[in-house]
From Swiss-Prot:
The lineage of its organism: Bacteria, Pseudomonadati, Pseudomonadota, Betaproteobacteria, Rhodocyclales. It comes from Dechloromonas aromatica (strain RCB). PANTHER family: HISTIDINOL-PHOSPHATE AMINOTRANSFERASE, HISTIDINOL-PHOSPHATE AMINOTRANSFERASE-RELATED. This is Histidinol-phosphate aminotransferase 2. The keyword Amino-acid biosynthesis applies. Transmembrane segments: none annotated. Its EC number is 2.6.1.9. The gene is hisC2.
Length: 356
């Protein structure tokens, strides 16, 4: 702590990102990265943008990222005026907390959810209230329909549980909260869920957030976007242009466009992850683990007779890293990224040895 710190900084409990260790021969299943590389079109687009001498890098990128907005609009059958883009979905979410979540009433989100939400509340002075998930870790939409609030936000599928809320439940929330923005954070929806973007033309209080880090294999480029009513998007643009007018660099823009346009590769990778997830779920169940239903690129699991922290430690000793959260209700669970078939086999072989 320094005497130069502001009171906001003194009061903050910062977000703790997933570990990015520099260990040789590591099987890294802790941060939900895609096990497959980006589309070959992404590599070609980056090379074309660089050219022979990378001279374009001396120039600022398009502050509006119009090419990317157009690609997102085409993909989701909306207008470009309904699309906002940012430096990863985390930046998009940060602007949402500043621009659209009311500060005169508490916002609401699940008690077990993406841990960046309370961090943003602390940073921007937003009051919040958490609502408990059901015993099966599902979200009960009725809980979000009978109380005043300054906004609603939740991941769908939820993180770190992987459980999906159907569109009719989201509509129930939207109808019950016409004067609050409902933010659906769909970082993992491409692995078996149905996007709520289909609802944005019917509800002016809906904002849907996506990332290209997971299903498009671009975690290293940091690209995210939001889709919603044009008035919501304008609010985000106003905050963005008061914070950083150039959030996406030239290479990120062309890489993201290429990734959005290669539908065949996208579908191939998503289907492969889903197939491996199903196999991993079956094998863990055979080993005695309880596995929550998942529509994400990870699974959330516990062993009824083995301590989760000890399991994570034993896996790490075998150069396999998974995520363990030291939080109430979930401290006996592990979140395991769906890796390649080979990585998941190494994981289950190790767990068989540890628990056998």
């Amino acid at each position: 702590m320094s005497r130069f710190w502001s009171q906001v900084v003194r009061d903050l409990t910062p977000y703790v990102p997933g570990e990015q260790p520099k260990i040789a021969n590591l099987i890294k299943l802790n941060t939900n990265e895609n096990p497959f590389p980006p589309s070959p079109r992404v590599v070609a687009a980056i090379q074309a943008e660089l050219g022979d001498d990378a001279a374009r890098l001396r120039l600022y990128p398009d502050p509006n990222a119009d090419l990317l907005k157009a690609a997102v609009a085409r993909r989701h059958t909306v207008s470009a005026q309904q699309v906002f883009v940012g430096n990863g979905s985390d930046e998009v979410l940060a602007h949402i907390f500043m621009a659209l979540l009311k500060h005169d009433q508490p916002i609401i989100f699940p008690d077990i959810t993406y841990s960046f939400y309370p961090v943003y509340c602390g940073l921007y002075g937003v009051e919040y209230q958490t609502l408990p998930l059901a015993d099966d870790f599902s979200i009960n939409p009725a809980d979000y329909c009978d109380r005043p609030n300054g906004g609603i936000i939740f991941p769908n599928p939820n993180a770190p549980t992987g459980r999906l809320l159907p569109l009719d439940a989201i509509e129930q929330m939207l109808k019950a909260n016409p004067d609050s923005v409902v933010v659906v954070d769909e970082a993992y929806v491409d692995f078996g869920g149905e996007t709520a973007i289909s609802l944005v033309d019917r509800y002016d209080n809906l904002l849907v957030v996506h990332t290209l880090s997971k299903s498009r294999s671009l975690a290293g480029m940091r690209v995210g976007f939001a889709v919603g009513h044009a008035a919501l998007i304008e609010a985000l643009e106003r905050v963005k242009n008061s914070f950083n007018s150039y959030p996406l660099d030239r290479l990120a823009i062309v890489a993201a466009v290429a990734a959005m346009e290669d539908e065949a590769y996208f579908a191939q990778c998503c289907h492969a992850v889903m197939a491996t997830r199903n196999t991993l779920t079956a094998e863990l169940t055979e080993l005695g683990f309880e596995v929550l239903p998942s529509t994400a690129n990870f699974i959330f699991t516990r062993h009824p007779q083995r301590d989760a922290a000890e399991l994570a430690k034993a896996l790490r000793e075998r150069n396999i890293i998974v995520r363990h959260f030291k939080l109430p209700r979930i401290d006996q669970f592990l979140r395991i990224t769906v890796g390649t078939d080979g990585e998941c086999k190494a994981l289950t072989d190790a767990l068989r040895q540890i628990t056998g």
